[in-house]
Regions:
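N-terminal basic/disordered segments at the start of proteins
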Residues: 1-65, 174, 185, 189-192, ...
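Short acidic (Asp/Glu) and glycine-rich catalytic loops that position anionic groups and cofactors
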Residues: 47-48, 126, 204-211, 239-246, ...
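Generic secondary-structure signature for well-ordered alpha-helical cores
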Residues: 74, 78, 108-111, 152-156, ...
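Terminal amphipathic helices with adjacent charged low-complexity linkers/tails
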Residues: 93, 97-98, 105-110, 235-299, ...
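Long hydrophobic segments that form regular secondary structure
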Residues: 303-312, 318-344, 480, 484-496
Length: 496
């Protein structure tokens, strides 16, 4: 075990002690969160159970890690696994002793939780199809993994004002959300020369902001200099006193964009003068053929790869919650088919890549009962209440109620978009960047406090056009399923 892992192992015993104090009400929710958040552990509502978030680097799931998660579900009788909106896995409803046991075992397998929460660099997001997507510029996977390694080697040393999110996209589709992160990179090329376009100081949640484009090309091998410069700027200019205004997006709002970019340049120059952070990775331009011979038709669960004859199957469980039994079925398939590769997405899905035609057919059949197939079925939702400590509304229940209403009334789902649902304004369900989004809250209506959701429309993410959704108003939670049903009928009439 290396020195860093030894430090992380020692932290687990401190978490164990703090967890028991919290359960016994000897320390507050805030005090416990201050200790546990940086370790990827949070108390659930009620104060007796806990959740753990694994730092599955950029969503890549090795066979060893798939097996490990499967074994955890069996040993600790975990019914469901949650795929998050940042390419990670969460396990819920665990006791603190079990949490600590899981962390120790995971550490032995290089599956980390450190930095899964708290004021640290979070999981580095990438396009889930990076390396196999038609039309991509180049595969960003190795660069993302190097950034993750760089972060993890220093994870216990960071003292940031708030969390820092980094994303890399392999094409202009911006599937990783580079244009809405603290630091984003999108693969590009000019005259056959690969480079990154860079974006700074964006983010979702309260007072969201689209990232600021950086007007210079970033050489792929130099990406760590730009990462380190942003960290240093964040430490120098971030707000350590007001948590509500501590994210990077508040810095250019305070300084002005021109001054912010000038300050960033100063930090970049200094980093380049003082450190050697060149990467020994070559960005190789991806090739997309003019013609392909795929026999299976594409749909929302099946994508043609740029490698002729190969497919990716997209498994989206309802609300990102996959039962442990269904997860095991997928894990067994991947273990039996060595060419298959699993990656988690930003949309609470698992992408199983590099499948030939026969393998794709088999996996589609295996997942048929639990794989959501239409856009509205593939809606996203954060965990919400009754699990989340800070959640206000039942986000997952809302999605279930919408689907039940549509199916009960035999309404066509064909024209409905996915809905992105957050249980509060924190945007864990990314409600601000979906075609339609909902954010939970409470509101007095007459003499009653009602369950309500703010409704947003028109959000989207891409290199050319990233838009934050417009808030239209607030709806009673009880009325939303019927509203979606009526919308479906109107869309069908207009053939949209």
């Amino acid at each position: 075990m290396n020195k860093q892992d030894e430090i992380l192992k020692l932290e687990i015993s401190k978490l164990h002690e703090a967890g028991h104090k919290f359960v016994n009400k000897e320390i507050s929710v805030g005090d416990f969160k201050g200790i546990s958040g940086g370790m990827g552990v949070y108390a659930q509502r009620g104060g007796q159970d806990f959740m753990i978030r694994f730092r599955t680097n950029s969503g890549l799931m090795s066979i060893d890690h798939l097996e490990l998660i499967k074994n955890f579900t069996e040993k600790y009788e975990i019914e469901d696994i949650h795929f998050t909106t940042r390419q990670a896995i969460q396990l819920h409803h665990l006791k603190i002793d079990d949490i600590c046991d899981i962390m120790e075992t995971a550490l032995e397998h290089k599956l980390y939780t450190r930095g899964g929460g708290g004021n640290y660099p979070r999981n580095v997001a990438i396009s889930p199809m990076s390396g196999v997507e038609k039309g991509e510029i180049f595969d960003v996977t190795e660069f993302a993994l190097k950034i993750s390694e760089y972060f993890m080697n220093r994870i216990t040393e960071y003292k940031l004002p708030r969390k820092l999110k980094v994303a890399l996209s392999s094409s202009d589709r911006d599937a990783a959300g580079a244009t809405i992160n603290d630091l984003g990179f999108i693969a590009a090329q000019e005259n056959g020369e690969p480079f990154f376009r860079m974006y700074l100081a964006g983010g979702l949640g309260n007072n969201p902001g689209i990232s600021i484009p950086y007007d210079k090309k970033v050489a792929p091998k130099e990406i760590l200099y730009y990462i380190e410069a942003m960290i240093n700027l964040f430490i120098a200019e971030g707000d350590y006193n007001n948590r509500a205004k501590a994210r990077t997006r508040y810095i250019p709002r305070r300084m002005g964009i021109a001054e912010f970019l000038a300050a960033y340049e100063k930090h970049l120059i200094k980093v380049k003068e003082e450190k050697n952070l060149d990467l020994d990775i070559k960005a190789v331009l991806s090739e997309t053929q003019e013609e392909y011979s795929h026999n299976l038709e594409e749909n929302l669960s099946l994508v043609h790869q740029r490698q002729d004859g190969l497919y990716t199957v997209i498994i989206h469980p309802l609300n990102g919650q996959i039962s442990s039994k269904d997860f095991e079925k997928v894990a067994v398939f991947i273990k039996e088919n060595k060419n298959a590769e699993a990656r988690l997405s930003m949309t609470e899905s698992m992408y199983v890549r590099n499948l030939n035609e026969e393998q794709a057919k088999v996996l589609l059949k295996i997942t048929d009962k639990f794989r959501q197939k239409t856009k509205i079925q593939q809606s996203m939702s954060c965990v919400g209440i009754p699990t989340c400590q800070i959640g206000i509304e039942q986000s997952q229940t809302l999605v279930k109620n919408i689907l039940e209403y549509i199916q009960k009334n035999n309404i066509s789902e064909e024209n409905l978009p996915s809905v992105y649902v957050s249980g509060c304004q924190n945007s864990c369900g990314r409600h601000q960047v979906g075609d339609m989004g909902f954010a939970g809250g409470k509101k007095r209506v007459g003499d009653k406090i009602e369950d309500v959701f703010d409704i947003y429309i028109g959000g989207m993410v891409s290199r050319e056009k990233t838009i934050l959704g417009t808030k239209l108003g607030t709806m009673l939670m009880s009325q939303i399923p019927e509203f979606i049903g009526e919308l479906a009928i109107e869309l069908e009439k207009s053939n949209m």
